[in-house]
UniProtKB/Swiss-Prot annotation:
It comes from the Eukaryota. InterPro entries: Hsk3 (IPR042332), Hsk3-like (IPR013183). The gene is HSK3. Its main location: nucleus. It is found in: Nucleus; Cytoplasm, Cytoskeleton, Spindle; Chromosome, Centromere, Kinetochore. This is DASH complex subunit HSK3. Component of the DASH complex that connects microtubules with kinetochores and couples microtubule depolymerisation to chromosome movement; it is involved in retrieving kinetochores to the spindle poles before their re-orientation on the spindle in early mitosis and allows microtubule depolymerization to pull chromosomes apart and resist detachment during anaphase. Keywords: Centromere, Chromosome, Cytoplasm, Cytoskeleton, Kinetochore, Nucleus. One of its GO terms (biological process) is attachment of spindle microtubules to kinetochore. One of its GO terms (cellular component) is kinetochore. Residues 1-24 are annotated as: Disordered.
Length: 88
């Protein structure tokens, strides 16, 4: 009987080893898939960061332009209010 039990044990170990190898292969395939997706997401993030940097520089220029317009409008409106006060 003990030889029969040993044979069953050995077969069980072999099937566990085989199934363990299949599990490991499946896990490695899943890991590879996740790493591929991560690499793609990082490339997308890098492109978005580049675009954001370009847009931030454009917004800086736009902000300077608007500041100039506000200063010019303030000067014109300030002169008009001074003239109105002198006229009264």
């Amino acid at each position: 009987m003990s030889s029969r039990g040993s044979g069953a044990n050995a077969a069980s170990r072999q099937s566990m080893t085989a199934s363990g190898g299949a599990v490991k292969a499946r896990q490695l395939a899943h890991l590879h898939s996740q790493l591929t997706q991560l690499s793609h997401n990082l490339a997308t993030t890098e492109n978005l960061m580049r675009m954001t940097a370009v847009q931030a520089e454009a917004m800086r220029g736009l902000g300077s332009w608007h500041a100039g317009l506000f200063m010019a409008a303030s000067k014109v409106l300030g002169e008009e209010s001074v003239q109105n006060q002198q006229g009264n």
